[in-house]
Curated annotation (Swiss-Prot):
The gene is Sh3gl3. Keywords: Coiled coil, Cytoplasm, Endocytosis, Endosome, Lipid-binding, Membrane, SH3 domain. This is Endophilin-A3. Residues 255-288 are annotated as: Disordered. Residues 218-254 are annotated as: Interaction with ARC. It comes from Mus musculus. It is found in: Cytoplasm; Early endosome membrane. Pfam families: BAR, SH3_1. It is a peripheral membrane protein.
Amino acid sequence: MSVAGLKKQFHKASQLFSEKISGAEGTKLDEEFLNMEKKIDITSKAVAEILSKATEYLQPNPAYRAKLGMLNTVSKLRGQVKATGYPQTEGLLGDCMLKYGKELGEDSAFGNSLVDVGEALKLMAEVKDSLDINVKQTFIDPLQLLQDKDLKEIGHHLRKLEGRRLDYDYKKRRVGKIPEEEIRQAVEKFEESKELAERSMFNFLENDVEQVSQLAVFVEAALDYHRQSTEILQELQSKLELRISLASKVPKREFMPKPVNMSSTDANGVGPSSSSKTPGTDTPADQPCCRGLYDFEPENEGELGFKEGDIITLTNQIDENWYEGMLRGESGFFPINYVEVIVPLPP
């Protein structure tokens, strides 16, 4: 910084100290200017908080948001274009219902109904994904631009005005000790900054209909989401009512106990051998797992490192490129093409 710059910073600091500590009064700006400044301040706070809350509205789970942020950052670093989507709660519940509905089979009324509801929830998750994309492009991104460009520029003008106001007031208090030319230049710069700040605030506030339009687009997107979701649920309700009606017309079966098959020793009065297999002692199915084909060294936080030949327990497939798993008590993510699946994850 030049000597003149250091001198100016000293003037500002000295004037600010006088106002805060000694109670010296600085130049007052007009009421209209102060009202605009207040509205700009409220607007800046509103935009910042709305951006945060809008993201929470679309993606309410902070843990998933953090995980997605990390995964998408890793994907970008590795040159992968496709981003991982947020796991919608409707889709997670739908997957669960589809899984157990298919396991119960087509001869189960409950199983068939679970499949119906699961498929409907998966459709709702797709509609929610569309809402996410739509709201981000038409509401969140424009608000972010407003914050990063227009409001940031106004803030710059206001800070510059305050700096020049302090410089002017410092020199004004020292009339006779400071050359009149310096005071005149300080007045000109102060008035120039005031006009710039005033014009930028005025133009912004006069055009706030743009923000109203963005709100209208947001409401339209939310309305479209709820309209499509309502249609899906109404169709699902009709399906379930039909299943209830059909199930009520099926004749009820009576329970008929089946006789126990007796062995030849049982027929002679000898009980079953104590060495016979006790029900329920079957070995449980193996956990989903995979074997490392190559060594994988984690480069980012949250990745799981392993050596060639390590057996890793699979817990989740994040996308077509990444698994989530556990090894020696540690959990993390690793690339699919580094492993060979031994026992696959359930569908």
